[in-house]
Amino acid sequence: MNKLPDGWTEYKLKDIMSISSKRYNPNKDTKNYKCIELEHIESETGILNGHTNSKDIHSVKNVFEKGEVLYGKLRPYLKKFYLAKFDGVCSSEIWVLKGKKVINDFLYYFIQQDNFNYIANVSIGMIMPRADWSYMSEISFNIPPLDEQKRIASALSKIDAYLENTIKLIEEKERFKRGIAKKLLTCKEGENIPEARFKGFEDEWETKTLENICKNIKTGKLNANAMEKDGLYRFYTCAKDYYKINTYAFDGEAILISGNGAHVGYVHYYNGKFNAYQRTYVLMDFTENILFIKYYLDIHLKYKINIENNKGNIPYIVLNTIKDMEIKFPSLEEQEKIGGYLSLLDAEIDNLKKQKELIKEMKRGAMQKLLSGEVRLVDNYD
């Protein structure tokens, strides 16, 4: 333990908080509640992204009340936590926590700190690691007095509100971009004219295949685990995010398409030196505007993949799926207009995502200082 700050008290975790033992049995309880599973809680942010209903479940769940704190004990490294805004039930893999020596608003931030996460990850079970309360409950922490708990919780909740507003803005921008992209890139039924277009463009669009307009279609050569920490170049697998590696096999402007896995058909655009997994398709040397093609594939490639899967084909992309993909093209000038506009929207979204990460970093720094007593908030902080 660190030096005890003035006015703070050292307690074992079992004296700081308790785990609720209330259970919901769908075979006996008839009232319907919102049910939170681990997948409904966003990692690291405490944001709830949905729920199911207790009437639709068949297993015993934990009961929680508004104001109690939920903490995912399964794979605690995922950092899933939520301050309940309603009464409900949740997965048995989620602890329902209530403060004993602390108020719940403070407890919500207490469980997010690095020291708590460290002991939570001294877990039991190899394949399905779970936090071990019998071990954790005996670990001691320094706790501030009640009035300081309130000030700390208030300060951190303001950062959370800023973070949540930024996330909502990202979601709104992404919804807008998806909607306008679909209208700009989808032709009316039986016609070669899009649902929406910029002023000054009236010509019909022309259908071409990717093979017609892309001179270089190949895959990467590497295994998916070839990534290297702190590598110099991007390494694209079939995931949504890229990794790093110290060697490159491609240099230039390219579209990359995930060829299998959970994100089959996901489309990346990159300009520079990079490497790729052996099931990632790399498309280079286009005769049409590459950004227009990228955004067109974002909208329409998944639809083609789904049709082929419904015919019984295995859920991965073969080369002919790429080559035979039909794209409707306007004039090069209109392609550039559409691609440029959508890339500007993407740039706005990327800037907001960077802002989101900066806010998360600011929150981590504030938690470190406030929850250790390194920084103390004065009585009239609010």
Regions found by a protein language model. Name each.
Residues M1-Y11, I143-E204, E326-D382:
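Amphipathic alpha-helical coiled-coil/heptad-repeat segments
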Residues M1-Y24, A196-G220, A226-T237:
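Non-catalytic DNA-recognition/assembly elements of restriction-modification systems
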Residues D6, L74, V89-W95, I124-D147, ...:
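A short glycine-rich beta-alpha junction/loop motif
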Residues T9, T52-N53, S59, F64-K66:
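Residue-level recognition of short, solvent-exposed, well-ordered loop/turn junctions
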Residues Y33-T52, V69-E93, N104-Y109, N117-S123, ...:
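Short, ligand-facing micro-motifs at secondary-structure edges
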Residues G50-S59, Y242, L283:
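Short alpha-helix capping/helix-loop boundary micro-motifs
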Residues I57-H58, S157, E164, K311:
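Short, solvent-exposed loop/turn positions at domain surfaces
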Residues F64, V69-L70, L156, L342:
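Generic structural signal for buried aliphatic residues
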